[in-house]
Regions:
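Short loop/edge segments at beta-strand edges and connector loops
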Residues: 32-36, 164
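Heptad-repeat coiled-coil signal-transmission/dimerization helices
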Residues: 14-18
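C-terminal regulatory
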Residues: 43, 55-171, 200-204
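Residues at or immediately flanking beta-strands
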Residues: 2, 25-31, 173-175
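A late-sequence structural motif
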Residues: 164-204
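Single conserved hydrophobic/aromatic residue that forms the stacking wall/gate
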Residues: 1-7, 11-12
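Pocket-flanking alpha-helical
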Residues: 40, 44-53
């Protein structure tokens, strides 16, 4: 089980690594479940999960996988038309896309970009809300506006530019989680070892 944010990226950018794992472990049956809600692994809905928050369950084994750093991004098309913001106050002149309601937020403070540089609890009004990070990415790529996105998701993009790179947003921890009852299970150990051996590639 993994959030749509992580799952979509794994299927698109990390497909060669998934194929490598399947080639090295042909006996392991893989089923990917994209779910933004944290399901109860003890019910055996899945063997492992990638959670965007540290799990509270005492019967889980967990290890931090990666820090997801958020920044504001815009497409070349958008920035050529509206200009590159130089200061946080310049953001008031720009169009924003934000994370909408209806799904768990993948960050603790999804409205931080709307509030950046604002005072007295005020925030900018987005022109569009999307309840998935991949939806935000597609909207940014299309030139709709600026949005807060995880750095690793756009690290290889040639169409998207980081705006105000010194203004770093919240950091979200991704955790690799599985029940203690599966601690010595070969398929769990195989995927855990493979995933952590590739985490350096995932960060780049």
């Amino acid at each position: 089980i993994m959030p749509r944010l992580v799952g979509s990226e794994m299927c698109i950018r990390d497909r060669p690594r998934i194929e490598e794992f399947m080639r090295l472990n042909p006996e392991v049956e893989i089923e990917l479940i994209f779910e933004d809600k944290e399901l109860d692994l003890s019910t055996r809905q899945a063997d492992i999960g990638i959670f965007m928050r540290r799990p509270k369950q005492l019967n889980y084994i967990q290890k931090k996988l990666i820090d997801l750093k958020y920044y504001i991004y815009g497409s070349n098309k958008y920035l050529e038309k509206y200009g590159m913001p130089k200061t946080v106050s310049d953001l008031n002149k720009h169009k924003f896309i934000s994370f909408g309601k209806g799904a768990p937020s993948p960050v603790y403070n999804p409205e931080w970009a709307l509030k950046l540089g604002m005072h007295d609890g005020k925030k900018r009004k987005p022109i569009m809300k999307v309840n998935s990070v991949m939806g935000l990415l597609l909207a940014v790529e299309s030139g709709v506006g600026l949005a807060a996105l995880p750095e690793y998701l756009v690290s290889n993009s040639t169409n998207i530019i980081k705006v105000l790179p010194k203004s770093e947003g919240p950091i979200t921890e991704a955790h690799f989680v599985y029940p203690q009852s599966l601690k010595n299970t070969a398929r769990v150990q195989a995927f855990r070892n493979f995933l952590f051996s590739k985490i350096g590639d995932w960060k780049s």
